[in-house]
Regions:
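RNase H-like two-metal-ion nuclease catalytic core shared by retroviral integrases
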Residues: 1-2, 109-111, 129-153, 161-164
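Short, aromatic/basic amphipathic alpha-helical patches
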Residues: 117-125
Length: 196
């Protein structure tokens, strides 16, 4: 697995020093995932000689799940919203800041345009730090989508967008209630290595 720049620990130390002393600093990784009604066929096991078949649909309706994950303790903030843009990203950041209101958060995120827009409202207890370009493998939050697709949205046929949204919401709620599962997916060793 690729590792981020060796400057990350030093960068985090500098950011932590900018926060008031005595406050806990929380490291979060953020990402968005798209879920909808287009079929996503997945493999499955079946006894011989059976050969399972899976239905498919091509309805282009989507919702977007926003998550911010704390690999250190398995805590997560999430929202399901109709699209991705600067305004809704600001809403998500405000919710995350409220959830982690007793901490100062450093949030690592990818380089999506709505993450860098001048109109983005970043809460006072939060600093945003971009991940290197073209490096989804460095973002532990990506594993949340993999988990949801493998465990809850295998070969789906949704009758409407609300059914897809309910399935994603149930899966996110289960992850909220299972910090150890979330931690096991997101606690990459390089995150906790001290600065050399």
């Amino acid at each position: 697995m690729r590792q981020p720049s060796k400057k990350l620990p030093e960068t985090l130390q500098v950011i932590a020093q900018s926060f008031p002393s005595g406050t806990r600093v929380c490291l979060l990784f953020q990402d968005e995932g798209r879920f909808g009604r287009i079929g996503d066929a997945r493999s499955c096991w079946a006894p011989l000689p059976l050969r399972p078949t899976v239905g498919s649909q091509l309805v282009r309706e989507y919702v977007y799940a926003y998550v911010a994950v704390s690999p250190a303790d398995g805590q997560m903030s999430s929202m399901i919203l109709p699209w991705v843009d600067t305004r809704l990203m600001s809403v998500f950041l405000a919710q995350t800041a409220a959830q982690f209101r007793n901490e100062h958060c450093v949030m690592l995120l990818d380089g999506a345009g709505w993450h860098k827009a001048h109109e983005l409202t970043v809460p006072i207890n939060m600093k945003l730090l971009p991940l290197p370009p073209y490096s989804p493998d460095l973002n532990p939050a990506e594993h949340v989508w993999e988990y949801i697709r493998e465990n809850d949205i295998r070969n789906p046929i949704f009758s409407d967008l609300d059914q897809a949204m309910d399935t994603v919401e149930t899966s996110l709620h289960r992850l909220h209630e299972s910090p150890e599962v979330l931690r096991s997916m997101t606690a990459f060793p390089w995150i906790f290595e001290p600065a050399a």
